[in-house]
Design a protein with these regions (language model features):
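Hydrophobic alpha-helical transmembrane segments of multi-pass membrane transport/permease proteins
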Residues: 6-44, 155-173, 213-216, 273-278, ...
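Hydrophobic alpha-helical transmembrane segments of multi-pass membrane transport proteins
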Residues: 150-223
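Junction motif at the cytosolic side of a transmembrane helix
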Residues: 9, 15, 41-42, 313-317, ...
């Protein structure tokens, strides 16, 4: 145990050899989340409306106030203006054309997705007016909320980035420092020392796990501070991350052992981290996309990790179709990664041919 403690202490001292890489690996996902949360789509859209001069215009304003989620915020925030010119924004004006009242919406945007969202909200407001005029013959819509309260998309986005933060820290730092052992010639110490290689690898994996948890905790804290929503179990969320951290650590260390160079190891970790994040339910649950994409996404370890974390942020709602299969999948990936790391370490460090 004392020898393991000395190995672990030596691993942490390696921070001094690459402090910038440590900061990039640990803080990059959190900084990315903070920036993305500022520009991300929100449920409530500002809609500029020319001050109404008719009773229909006043009714339209009232209808706008009714458009929203039954368990969440309004979808439209009306802003009354006097100038019908949209400028670089958008404006709605109730006008008379051929004796008929028309809601004229003028856009100064080039963002087609934002225009689509604003048109949908205007249609919803007009549907409210239409239903009032139709009376008993109006279109009846029954809404059945899936959750007690609406949760903003920034929560899902941040939750899905927690595995990214853990993976990136473990893979990038593991690969970079392992490659440095070859570049600096210190790999000879591992080849000649009497300490068993499982103990050496255990110290490296333990250190990477602590670093990965640090990156994930930082992102988790900013997720809670920005959205005001915290998981129902902090411990459960981070226990779920353990298989992914071990997988990432093994991939990073193996990259360093194979390439013997810091830059390729750095790039392999970066590319694999973002590929796993993008394909592995980074922007939405895999079940919400095409069948082909879902099948590919379920091959990525991030997807079962996110599905297991989901209930702790979304009132206990389960989304994993096959929880047992997902657990077995992660166990299999983890065991394969550990075996692969041992094999590569033996070939690249302990082999007599080296």
């Amino acid at each position: 145990m004392r020898r393991f403690s000395l190995l672990l202490r030596n691993e942490f001292k390696s921070f001094l050899t690459a402090p910038v890489v440590h900061l990039i690996a640990i803080l990059q996902p959190t900084l990315m989340y903070i920036l993305m949360s500022v520009i991300m789509v929100v449920p409530t859209f500002e809609m500029r409306i020319v001050n109404p001069s008719s009773s229909l215009g006043a009714r339209f304003i009232a209808a706008v106030d009714e458009v929203g989620s039954p368990v969440g915020p309004d979808y439209i925030e009306p802003i009354l203006v006097d100038d019908p010119s949209p400028g670089f924004r958008q404006v709605v004006e109730i006008i008379e054309t051929d004796g008929n009242s028309t809601a004229l919406q003028t856009y100064g945007y080039i963002d087609s997705n934002l225009v689509k969202n604003l048109r949908n909200r205007l249609t919803a407001a007009l549907l409210v007016l239409w239903n009032i005029d139709l009376g008993d013959q109006g279109i009846t819509i029954h809404e059945h909320p899936w959750l007690p309260n609406d949760i903003p998309y920034t929560v899902y986005f941040g939750m899905a980035m927690i595995p990214l933060a853990a993976y990136l820290a473990a893979a990038m730092i593991g690969g970079y420092l392992m490659a440095q052992e070859f570049e600096n010639g210190t790999i000879l110490i591992y080849r000649l020392c009497p300490t068993s290689y499982p103990l050496i690898l255990a110290a490296k994996l333990t250190r990477l796990m602590i670093i990965a948890f640090t990156g994930a905790v930082i992102l988790y804290l900013f997720l809670g501070l920005i959205t005001g929503i915290w998981s129902s179990s902090f411990i459960a969320v981070f226990v779920i991350l353990i298989p992914l951290i071990l997988i990432a650590s093994c991939i990073g260390l193996a990259a360093g052992l194979i390439t013997h160079s810091s830059l390729p190891s750095f790039l392999i970790a970066l590319a694999s981290a973002f590929a796993f994040w993008l394909i592995g339910s980074g922007f939405g649950l895999a079940a919400g996309f095409s069948t082909i994409f879902e099948k590919i996404s379920r091959l990525i370890p991030n997807t079962p990790i996110i599905e297991m974390m989901f209930p702790y942020f979304y009132y206990g709602r389960q989304v994993a179709a096959h929880p047992l299969a997902a657990n077995l999948q992660l166990i299999g990936y983890t065991l394969f990664s550990l075996i692969m790391l041992v094999f590569v370490y033996q070939k690249r460090v302990l082999s007599k041919d080296r």
